[in-house]
């Protein structure tokens, strides 16, 4: 039996209204606090907190490595209270050169592989910041961005990084929120910077004009892109579908037989899954003419060898592999990011404009900070100048007077 002592505090609510409000608050929390990147620095909160925790641990590129368990523990304990097991996979991805076009973390140890092998436990792996991450956090101590309290109000964390380079455009992002998702392609940093320079010189340029500077996605795993229509679509609208192909060449053996050598595969494709799919198509006779599939990948890079039977045309076999396996696959672009805390779909001009506006704000705040410091320093230097101009009189006064009287005289002289 439940005893209710204060019935005036009981509020009658419709369950539909409560569920609607609770679900909306939950979905917005996932969207803003977890799944979608900020258009300014291209990072999700978990990524930003990991990098900031490493910054506080002084894990600069020239310094030593630290255990990932220490980094994950500090991140979880100070900024991201969801446990080290949630933090570690995010840390690992920022160190994988097949996941990010420009990695933000320099990992030491087993950080997984393109075959889908898991990384070693965090107690065995070590990490430090890459130069790219340092550039993202450059001028953080010059009042360039706002800070806010962490989850338990014991310290502060940056709401965004100053971001010297357009991380969202060059590294892309992916995430699934409640009722929406994002899937943004990485690009070549030189091409992106050329596009930004063109925009600064001509802010009236349209999104389609960026095609003169940005050829298309620059996936870290290499490969080819088939056609330009998908690129044009997402440059103009923020949505598009890009067809990717792995890089393959036909080599001839001394005995006259041919083999297909794959050296690059589409982005986000697991190499082991590709091999299994090729074997499956051979067993089901969808692709005929393959006698052997070998993975000869090593330190020199990827090398997947498919031996073609005699009397079969290697080029025909390769075209069937494009058709029936993931050697040809698509990347669906959905440029959704947070703009002032609100999720928006952005075309290329929108993303560049937001980045340029943000950098303008950062540089303005940094300049004001440095000006204030210089003005404070100016007051001290002015005192030095007056002292040097009257050095003989000052020395005479100090020697002839007690300390309090000398201090009073010097203060009047400076005023």
State the predicted function of each range.
Residues 2-238, 303-305:
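Catalytic phosphate-handling regions of large nucleic-acid enzymes and associated NTPases
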Residues 2-5, 23, 65-67, 102-108, ...:
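Flexible hinge/switch segments at interdomain interfaces of large molecular machines
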Residues 3-4, 9, 396-415:
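C-terminal engagement/docking regions of AAA+ P-loop ATPases
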Residues 4-12, 16, 23, 31, ...:
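Long, charged, helix-rich clamp/arm modules that form nucleic acid-engaging surfaces
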Residues 27, 50, 95, 179, ...:
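Residue-level signature of catalytic and energy-coupling elements of molecular machines
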Residues 124, 175, 241-245, 257-259, ...:
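Broad gene-expression machinery/nucleic-acid interaction feature
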Residues 192, 274-277, 317-318:
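Hydrophobic side chains in well-ordered alpha-helices
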Residues 249-293:
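Long hydrophobic segments that form regular secondary structure
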């Amino acid at each position: 039996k439940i005893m209710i002592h204060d019935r005036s505090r009981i509020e009658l609510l419709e369950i539909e209204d409560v569920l609607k409000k609770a679900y909306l608050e939950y979905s917005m929390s996932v969207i803003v606090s977890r799944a979608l990147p900020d258009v300014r620095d291209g990072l999700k909160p978990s990524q930003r907190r990991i990098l900031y925790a490493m910054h506080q641990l002084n894990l600069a590129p020239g310094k030593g490595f630290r255990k990932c368990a220490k980094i994950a523990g500090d991140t979880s304990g100070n900024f991201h209270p969801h446990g080290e097991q949630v933090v570690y996979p995010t840390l690992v991805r920022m160190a994988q050169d097949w996941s990010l076009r420009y990695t933000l973390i320099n990992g030491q140890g087993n950080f997984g592989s393109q075959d889908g092998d898991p990384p070693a436990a965090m107690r065995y792996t070590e990490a430090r910041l890459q130069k790219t991450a340092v550039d993202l956090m450059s001028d953080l101590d010059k009042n360039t961005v706002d800070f806010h309290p962490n989850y338990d109000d014991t310290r502060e964390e940056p709401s965004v990084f100053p971001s010297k380079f357009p991380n969202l455009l060059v590294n892309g992002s992916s995430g699934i929120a409640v009722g929406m998702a994002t899937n943004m392609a990485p690009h070549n940093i030189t091409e992106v910077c050329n596009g930004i320079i063109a925009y600064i010189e001509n802010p009236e340029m349209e999104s389609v004009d960026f095609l003169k500077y940005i050829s298309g996605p620059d996936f870290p795993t290499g490969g080819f892109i088939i056609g330009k229509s998908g690129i044009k679509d997402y440059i103009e609208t923020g949505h598009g579908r890009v067809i990717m192909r792995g890089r393959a060449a036909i080599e001839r053996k001394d005995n006259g037989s041919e083999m297909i050598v794959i050296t690059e595969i589409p982005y986000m494709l697991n190499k082991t899954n590709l091999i299994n799919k090729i074997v499956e198509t051979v067993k089901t006779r969808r692709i005929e003419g393959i006698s052997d599939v070998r993975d000869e990948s090593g330190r020199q890079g990827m090398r997947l060898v498919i031996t073609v039977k005699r009397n079969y045309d290697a080029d025909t076999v390769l075209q069937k592999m494009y058709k029936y396996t993931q050697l040809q696959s698509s990347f669906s672009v959905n440029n959704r990011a947070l703009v002032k805390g609100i999720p928006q779909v952005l075309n290329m001009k929108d993303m560049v404009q937001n980045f340029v506006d943000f950098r303008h704000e950062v540089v303005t705040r940094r300049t004001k900070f440095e000006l204030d410091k210089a003005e404070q320093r100016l007051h001290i230097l002015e005192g030095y100048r007056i002292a040097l101009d009257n050095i003989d009189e000052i020395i005479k006064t100090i020697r002839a007077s007690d300390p309090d009287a000398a201090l009073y005289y010097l203060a009047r002289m400076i005023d």
